[in-house]
Amino acid sequence: MTASQDFVVKDISLADWGRRELDIAETEMPGLMAAREEFGKSQPLKGARISGSLHMTIQTAVLIETLKVLGAEVRWASCNIFSTQDHAAAAIAATGTPVFAVKGETLEEYWTYTDQIFQWPDGEPSNMILDDGGDATMYILIGARAEAGEDVLSNPQSEEEEVLFAQIKKRMAATPGFFTKQRAAIKGVTEETTTGVNRLYQLQKKGLLPFPAINVNDSVTKSKFDNKYGCKESLVDGIRRGTDVMMAGKVAVVCGYGDVGKGSAQSLAGAGARVKVTEVDPICALQAAMDGFEVVTLDDAASTADIVVTTTGNKDVITIDHMRKMKDMCIVGNIGHFDNEIQVAALRNLKWTNVKPQVDLIEFPDGKRLILLSEGRLLNLGNATGHPSFVMSASFTNQVLGQIELFTRTDAYKNEVYVLPKHLDEKVARLHLDKLGAKLTVLSEEQAAYIGVTPQGPFKSEHYRY
C-alpha cells in the first residue's frame, strides 16, 4: 500500500473476474437492488463514513456498492483471515473503494487491516461501524480504555489477543488519542452475527456500550434464513471442496442446535450422513430429537464420528481429549464465528501436513490422523465461498436499513442494543418473494380485524417465534 494506493488486495488484475461474478450476484440479491432503487435519489447515507469489517466476498461487494449508491463513504476489511474472495476484493478496490483483505492473512495482517478501515486520508474519524463478529468495534473500545489508563493490554489470553494488543499499542504510539477520538465520533454500529451480538449485550450489561447498536442477527430475515438456510447449503459445500469425501452413510456430529446447528444438521442429513447432535439447552435438544436426530454427548460420540462440526459460538467445544478419542481421518471443522470452538492451539505441537490451502492433516504420536478444515475457523468461507447470494441479500438488506436508521435517527436511540422493528423485517421478506415466484394472500379488512392486525401488517407480535 502506498499513498496513491489506498488498498491491499492479492491481485488487482482479478477485478474483471470479480466484476463478472458481481453482475451475476446482483440478479440474486433483490433486497439490495430494491434498496438502491428506493433510497438512491434521497442519499440517506450522505456524510456517513462507514468502517466495515465483514467477510470480503462477492455478496459483500454488492453490499458495499449499495452503501455507496446511498451516499456513504466506505473503508472495508474482512472479519476472518480465510474468508476473503480475492477477485471480489479486487473488484471493489478497482472502483476506488479502500479495501484491505487477502485470503490467508496472518494475524498481524488481519489486525493491521482492521486498523486501516479507520484511517481516512483526511485524518478525520469514521462515524459508523458495520461489523461481523465485533472485532472492529472491540478494537476501538479496547484501545479507548487503554488510552484512559485502564490496564487492558498487559495480560493477553491467546495468540490473537497478543497480536491485537500489539496493534493497539502501535496505533497509540503513532497517533496519541486516536481511539478516544474515534469512539466519540461513532454514531452507531450494526452487527451481523451471533458472536458479535453477544459481545454487544455484554457491553450493555456492564454499562460500557458508548453508542447505539442494531442487532441485525436477530432480525427474523437474518437468523432464520442466513443462519439456517445459508448453512444448509454452504456447510456441505465447504466439506466437499476441502476433502472430496463422500458423506452418504458417514456418521456426522453437529455440536449445537441453534439456527446454525439446525441448518448444519439438515445440510449433512441431506447429503446422506447419519447425523447426531450435541446440546446443552434442553429445548434445543428436544427439537433435535423430534427432528429425528440422536442427541448425544461428544464424549460418547467422538470415537465413532467421521465428521464433527461445531456451530455454538462458545469456546472449547471440541477439546484435545475429544480429538484423542476420534478415529483415524475424522474430519474436524467449525462453522461458528471464531476459531476457539476447537482447541486448535493444543494441536500445534503435533505433526501438521498441509494438504492444500485451509486443509491440514494432523498426526498424533500413535499415527492417528485428523483432517482439520480452515484451522478451526469458518469452514464454509475458508474452504468454499460461503452462503449463496440470495440468502445474503436478506441479511445485508437488514444491514443497510440498520445503517440508515442509526445514521439518520441517532438521537432516537440510547446507548443500547436494538433489533429492527417488525415492519422492516416483513419488508425485507416481501422484497425477496417475487424472485421465488411466491404470491401473498391478502387479508380482508374483516379478517385483519378479527386477529388484531392491519391488512398491510405487521402480522405477528414482537415475541412471536417463527
Curated annotation (Swiss-Prot):
<dbReference type="InterPro" id="IPR036291">
    <property type="entry name" value="NAD(P)-bd_dom_sf"/>
</dbReference>
<feature type="binding site">
    <location>
        <position position="222"/>
    </location>
    <ligand>
        <name>substrate</name>
    </ligand>
</feature>
<feature type="binding site">
    <location>
        <position position="57"/>
    </location>
    <ligand>
        <name>substrate</name>
    </ligand>
</feature>
<protein>
    <recommendedName>
        <fullName>Adenosylhomocysteinase</fullName>
        <ecNumber>3.13.2.1</ecNumber>
    </recommendedName>
</protein>
<feature type="binding site">
    <location>
        <position position="380"/>
    </location>
    <ligand>
        <name>NAD(+)</name>
    </ligand>
</feature>
<keyword id="KW-0963">Cytoplasm</keyword>
<dbReference type="GO" id="GO:0006730">
    <property type="term" value="P:one-carbon metabolic process"/>
</dbReference>
<feature type="binding site">
    <location>
        <position position="314"/>
    </location>
    <ligand>
        <name>NAD(+)</name>
    </ligand>
</feature>
<feature type="binding site">
    <location>
        <begin position="256"/>
        <end position="261"/>
    </location>
    <ligand>
        <name>NAD(+)</name>
    </ligand>
</feature>
<comment type="function">
    <text>May play a key role in the regulation of the intracellular concentration of adenosylhomocysteine.</text>
</comment>
<feature type="binding site">
    <location>
        <position position="227"/>
    </location>
    <ligand>
        <name>NAD(+)</name>
    </ligand>
</feature>
<dbReference type="GO" id="GO:0004013">
    <property type="term" value="F:adenosylhomocysteinase activity"/>
</dbReference>
<comment type="pathway">
    <text>Amino-acid biosynthesis; L-homocysteine biosynthesis; L-homocysteine from S-adenosyl-L-homocysteine: step 1/1.</text>
</comment>
<feature type="binding site">
    <location>
        <position position="279"/>
    </location>
    <ligand>
        <name>NAD(+)</name>
    </ligand>
</feature>
<feature type="binding site">
    <location>
        <position position="192"/>
    </location>
    <ligand>
        <name>substrate</name>
    </ligand>
</feature>
<feature type="binding site">
    <location>
        <begin position="193"/>
        <end position="195"/>
    </location>
    <ligand>
        <name>NAD(+)</name>
    </ligand>
</feature>
<keyword id="KW-0554">One-carbon metabolism</keyword>
<dbReference type="Pfam" id="PF05221">
    <property type="entry name" value="AdoHcyase"/>
</dbReference>
<dbReference type="InterPro" id="IPR015878">
    <property type="entry name" value="Ado_hCys_hydrolase_NAD-bd"/>
</dbReference>
<dbReference type="GO" id="GO:0071269">
    <property type="term" value="P:L-homocysteine biosynthetic process"/>
</dbReference>
<dbReference type="Pfam" id="PF00670">
    <property type="entry name" value="AdoHcyase_NAD"/>
</dbReference>
<keyword id="KW-0520">NAD</keyword>
<comment type="similarity">
    <text>Belongs to the adenosylhomocysteinase family.</text>
</comment>
<dbReference type="GO" id="GO:0033353">
    <property type="term" value="P:S-adenosylmethionine cycle"/>
</dbReference>
<dbReference type="GO" id="GO:0005829">
    <property type="term" value="C:cytosol"/>
</dbReference>
<keyword id="KW-0378">Hydrolase</keyword>
<dbReference type="InterPro" id="IPR020082">
    <property type="entry name" value="S-Ado-L-homoCys_hydrolase_CS"/>
</dbReference>
<feature type="binding site">
    <location>
        <position position="132"/>
    </location>
    <ligand>
        <name>substrate</name>
    </ligand>
</feature>
<dbReference type="InterPro" id="IPR000043">
    <property type="entry name" value="Adenosylhomocysteinase-like"/>
</dbReference>
<feature type="binding site">
    <location>
        <begin position="335"/>
        <end position="337"/>
    </location>
    <ligand>
        <name>NAD(+)</name>
    </ligand>
</feature>
<feature type="binding site">
    <location>
        <position position="226"/>
    </location>
    <ligand>
        <name>substrate</name>
    </ligand>
</feature>
<dbReference type="InterPro" id="IPR042172">
    <property type="entry name" value="Adenosylhomocyst_ase-like_sf"/>
</dbReference>
